[in-house]
Amino acid sequence: MRKKVVSPAQRRAFAREVVNQELCSQRGACRILGLARSTFNYHGRPPTPAEEQLRKRLLELSTEHPRYGYRRIAALLRREGWRVGKRHIQRLRRDEGLRVPPTKRKIVRRGVSTGLPTTATHRNHVWTWDFIADATVRGGALKLLTILDEYTRECHVLWAERALKSADVLHWLQKAVEQHGAPEYLRSDNGSEFIAKIVQRWLKTNRIKTIYIEPGSPWQNGFVESFHGRFRDECLNREQLWTLTEARVVVGDFRRKYNEVRPHSRLGYESPAMFAARSCPFPAPVGLRPPSTGNGQRNNENINSNKCLD
């Protein structure tokens, strides 16, 4: 019979329980628990009708606002005209067994980086990928996948869907690698699509190292965040997208102009395609090993894929 006894009221209740079970005398129980016999024999005065009404209202407010602590509950009661202090309310809540349950911390899944944080020094050195969200005029969700080369700033993939799963992002990554060659490193956040086992197996098979940024640190993926800022400012905020098909056409046209026409200040005001052609001749695409599972492989290519890839 082991209990954690802290307050005098708890010690008194425990001592009475021991005495009622005839396990010990009253004097012995008080001596063992460090409780005065006057405290053992103390019986509080019965609650007044006003006290009963206060307790009833306290329970009502605590049920209505389960995340409010004793300070806010006391403030609400004083607003209603009750003359109470916060310590009084704290004691009443404790007597009633009321408390604000602690917030459960969310388990943050994190990918395991297989490469060190690296700054791109040549084409296909570091790629980065991420999502950006938008909506159609009627409120339909749009989720867009972006894949960039951090050195040339070329946008290899910009694809819109209602929802994108790990098999979908792997499909578009495969197509980008088949056309542009494989990167040495792939940078991303810890999104569930990017740390999925099917993606991890494929990257390991094709010897592509991963660089996962710290949770809640988008600045560590600054290239794609900068691109998304330009994309939203120059395209998404200016266009009214009514359907998914229209969204694919619009973002495909933006990707083409971004790669081939738009001057980029970091590239000496050349377009990414011009910079890539001048400074780094196109490498021969490397051969790919098949994925370790068939879940991420698609047999039929989407008819609109030519608007997503170069």
Language-model features: where?
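Charged, often Cys/His-bearing segments associated with DNA-binding zinc-finger transcription factors
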Residues: 3-32, 287-310
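Mobile-element integrase/transposase regions
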Residues: 83-148, 154, 166-175, 179-184, ...
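Mobile genetic element proteins and their domesticated derivatives, centered on retroelements
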Residues: 29-30, 40, 58, 73, ...
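RNase H-like two-metal-ion nuclease catalytic core shared by retroviral integrases
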Residues: 49, 188-192, 196-201, 210-233, ...
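Residue-level signal for the short linker/turn that defines the boundary of a DNA-recognition helix
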Residues: 23-25, 68, 84, 242
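Short small-residue beta-strand/loop micro-motif enriched in glycine and branched aliphatics
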Residues: 39-42, 154-158, 210-213, 237
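C-terminal domain-tail junction helix/linker
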Residues: 206-208, 229-310
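Basic, flexible linker segments flanking DNA-binding modules
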Residues: 4-13, 30, 35-126, 217, ...
